Amino acid sequence: MLTNPTIETLKTLKLYGMLEALEEQQQTPAIQALTFEERFAALIDRERLHRDNQRRTRLLRGAHLKVAAASIEDINYKAARGLDKRQIAQLATGEWIRRTQNLLITGATGSGKTWIACALAQQTCRQGASVLYWRVPRLIEELRIAHGDGSYLKFLKTLSKAALIVLDDWALTALSNQDRADLLEILDDRVNTGSTLIASQLPVDKWHAYLGEPTLADAILDRIVHHSHRIELKIPGESMRRVRASADP
């Protein structure tokens, strides 16, 4: 039986996975057939699994995904919206994140952009990488506030640390020159250091006109369009929001 000092020591060291596994071993007579090394290896494996699960939970909570339940396993390929299953499978490996490449998802309202973006972001968290989700209108507002209260540089640093940033609702609202400059700062910080996933109703070839100021537009697009993967979604006849709502119990 585990003694109270042993239990307290494991708790003090925050070895909760090991403690749980050790208690299970104490309640399993057949475990005595294993060698000490085998039992100890099982404890270490459980502790590592426990920590991995905790990290994934923290990453998912910190990502603030709009659709937290979205997962690549539940992506609907039956709807005729231009999804390539092989492309999604490749993106799901996370190799594009490791190579600090970008992903641009475009399509009309209801085509499932946000859901797919969140599914890939969730997959990134499950693989142990950090994610931040932002709707661009809200991000712009937060940047304006940060300029006013002196937290701008700290905010930029926080954004730069994420392995993946999801910028949803790109090109939805008008931008000021300061907004454009802020977006350039964010994207420039991520060159060769992090990936950016952009979801937008507006086709990529119209982004330059949307951004407006030619010099800043060139600089912004240079940092996101090159070395990027693209998914262009089509409306399958019915909004994917309605399709999912009707499928819910």
Regions found by a protein language model. Name each.
Residues 1-20:
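Charged, compositionally biased N-terminal leader segments and the immediate start
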Residues 83-161, 211:
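Conserved P-loop
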